[in-house]
């Protein structure tokens, strides 16, 4: 892809937030709060560092595998804590139904990004 077409992850988070706000027909005031909160949420997630991937190569010792599993548990716990923190933030200006729909939209976007990533990874 053209370098000018590449979007920073901060810009992508803002685009995602605006898309979700538009899809859920938030008012301008709520949209502004949502976009800012969603972008902060994404920054907190990114601050955790890269996701730990399972060892697909094999050959790792039992101890290595145990350590990797424990690291993934720790990462999952940190992500859960961040999600709970932002759930409380969203609850200040969104209804519970709206929050549920935000999570649904977020899952749909993640699936779409995963599909795009696979398409780009496959040789033509």
What are the roles of these predicted feature ranges?
Residues 16-93:
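Amphipathic alpha-helical segments
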Residues 80, 84-124:
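Amphipathic, charged alpha-helical segments and their helix-to-coil junctions
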Residues 8:
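Metal-dependent catalytic neighborhoods of phosphoester/phosphodiester hydrolases
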Residues 1-5:
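Bacterial Sec-dependent N-terminal signal peptides
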């Amino acid at each position: 892809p053209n370098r000018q077409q590449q979007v920073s992850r901060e810009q992508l988070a803002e685009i995602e937030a605006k898309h979700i706000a538009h899809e859920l027909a938030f008012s301008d005031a709520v949209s502004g709060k949502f976009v800012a909160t969603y972008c902060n949420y994404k920054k907190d997630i990114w601050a955790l560092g890269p996701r730990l991937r399972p060892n697909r190569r094999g050959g790792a010792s039992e101890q290595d595998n145990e350590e990797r599993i424990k690291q993934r548990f720790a990462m999952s716990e940190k992500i859960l804590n961040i999600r709970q923190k932002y759930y409380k933030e969203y609850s200040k200006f969104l209804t519970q139904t709206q929050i549920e729909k935000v999570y649904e939209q977020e899952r749909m976007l993640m699936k779409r990004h995963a599909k795009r990533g696979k398409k780009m990874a496959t040789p033509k």
